[in-house]
């Protein structure tokens, strides 16, 4: 215990007084009776409660949230999480699990349905057999989780040190297996993902894999991704592999070149240049390594921040950046798109860079920026005009005002837009008023207002826009209604953060926006994940155990399935019945 804390011994806790009651019993009675004697009229009517329970090692073993229900957690003897079960999984008798190797590194994670009765003991956070109460062994030598389940789903396996597959078969930068082994020692060699996994599944039967080859310094030298959906033939086990090779400055660690699919038809190369402070100053690309296109070059202020970006080898755009004294972004290019007012002079008769296509400024408080250059007044002419500037000064980093200038597809100047923002005491935006500027003449345009409940959920949203006749008209007057749900402990109906439906008081809108919804438009599963949107024709949404969308079923019969790699990145989408597949 901490210094100054003297714990009761078991003998002291079990010692009885004259009435025969132990000290431990009297402590428990006091706790119970003291709560009963509390004056409930002095207590607030708490709603949307989130509750936590911990074991004696201060590990979270149980939690209950307003939308996510009850989740239980189990740990091994070393305090590592080995299993969990949320409200969705309880109904399906499913558990999420994690396994470790002898060095404590995660080697497998996924979900399982046990073949024997198991449960998580809430008070201790241990995984036990339901019939006997004995603790489930999670040691490597006891073959956890095979000892409780034959089949698992959505499994990610991580392999260290070496691969069971020949490295020379996978990597183009490996010629000697022993050299490969020496650079991957104690490093991740491969990450495998399996939709289905059983005790008979071979390592090579993965759905997706990521392989790593390192240089002697531990930098990734080659990264190979193998998506079997991309395989052109089943006869070649390497078909579908995509390889990316990296070249580094071995002193600074900077990436000098990235080559995708070297020597293949889809080869593409990025090359990077740096200054003496290791800041990137140029990016070039090529599909053959001989003819290069400059994508961008960068310049910096003496104190570090990015000062200018020039895009393309033809210098199609220049982006100039200005910052406040606090380091907050003040503006990009300027507000008027006038070459004489641009910080970089782009588009002027003496410049090789095309005229700016966009510019904007951000204002925080009056006098938040003063330039050391000569174009300050003209670069931010609208922000500095007393008749245009918002008087709602903010000193916490929130933006009080934004000025935006753009050109259209025909390179004609659009009206400059100035937006004023207001916030509540919790820094939530509550109002936006937009105006169009013609010279210094202000014409009100877009505006919106927001209100929230005490839990931060939107209650009302009002929006107005400019119609085709140039008049400002109401577009939305939205009212958000939230569901009541059944408390899993008490069985009573309680409030939640789950949106039930959105009412729009503006009838007959011609803006192709959100239409008025009926009560109960949205439905959710036991852990608060959206599973139905009636108005959008979404009949059901299936979710993976890691919280990513697995499949969407629509009322018209369309099914959209999504696929992921072992790191959780989306790698594919399939649409049925059209049977159209997109791979990433």
Feature map (PLM): residue ranges:
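Beta-strand elements of repeat-based all-beta scaffolds
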Residues: 1-534, 539-542, 548-553, 559-575, ...
